[in-house]
């Protein structure tokens, strides 16, 4: 864990960090408010010394969309490339936002993932929609969305996703779900392989549970 937030590193400082082999085991790097522009962000994104980085805070810097995209690609590669032999990907409590899920949806290596856990992050139905629409998630059999504010809209997008047709286990505990979302699940043409469904901690009334009967 290295916190260098609120300093004046600029692009040159970012390049020094990117070229430092001593950071090869670093998992969390905080560089918010450091006047880092596109060249500095691209140096970090292309660094081979940050292969183990899981959390990167670059808020309030000066890079534009290309730099942001490159940094998202770095984080995505680092997260997914650590996929274990069981093909399970644990991305719990990593402060993932909608843009992070979009980056995941564009990464072809996601085709290898069989189990994906996204518990307690910061995305909503929009981020989930990006992921669910990706052809690269078609092999996922277990999906944990516990403690995310996806609501009925998120469940509807999930229910309408052909890429989710292999799902056997779905955890929707504490996801702000109501009976409207349950109806979407029950009527989904794609979620026919579900064997285990966790709906604990939601606002589902009697009518909602009847939809599942």
Predicted segments — roles?
Residues 28-33, 49-65, 72-78:
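Leucine-rich repeat domain C-terminal region
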Residues 83-128, 140, 146:
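LRR N-terminal entry segment and analogous cap-like coil->beta motifs
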Residues 2-4, 26-31, 56-58, 89-94, ...:
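Conserved hydrophobic beta-strand positions in leucine-rich repeat
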Residues 11-19, 38-46, 65-80, 97-106, ...:
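Leucine-rich repeat
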Residues 24-25, 42:
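Intrinsically disordered, low-complexity repeat tracts
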Residues 1-2, 193-195, 205-213:
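Short, intrinsically disordered, charge-balanced linker/junction segments flanking boundaries
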Residues 21-24, 48-51, 84, 89, ...:
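Inter-repeat linker/turn residues at the boundaries of leucine-rich repeats
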């Amino acid at each position: 864990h290295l916190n260098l937030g609120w300093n004046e590193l600029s692009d040159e400082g970012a390049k020094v960090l990117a070229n430092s082999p001593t950071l090869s085991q670093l998992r969390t790097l905080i560089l918010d408010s450091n006047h880092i522009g596109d060249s500095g962000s691209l140096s970090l994104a292309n660094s081979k010394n940050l292969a183990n980085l899981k959390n990167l805070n670059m808020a309030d810097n000066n890079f534009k969309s290309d730099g942001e995209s490159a940094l998202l690609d770095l984080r995505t590669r680092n997260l997914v490339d650590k996929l274990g032999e069981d093909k399970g990907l644990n991305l719990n409590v990593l402060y993932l936002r909608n843009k992070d899920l979009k980056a995941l949806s564009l990464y072809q290596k996601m085709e290898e993932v069989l189990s994906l856990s996204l518990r307690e992050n910061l995305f909503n139905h929009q981020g989930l929609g990006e992921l669910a629409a990706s052809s690269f998630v078609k092999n996922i059999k277990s999906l944990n969305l516990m403690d995310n504010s996806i609501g009925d809209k998120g469940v509807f997008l999930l229910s309408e996703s052909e890429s989710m047709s292999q799902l056997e286990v779905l955890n929707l505990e504490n996801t702000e779900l109501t009976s409207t979302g349950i109806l979407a699940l029950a009527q989904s043409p794609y979620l026919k392989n579900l064997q285990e469904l966790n709906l604990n901690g939601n606002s589902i009334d009697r009518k909602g549970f009847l939809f599942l009967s």
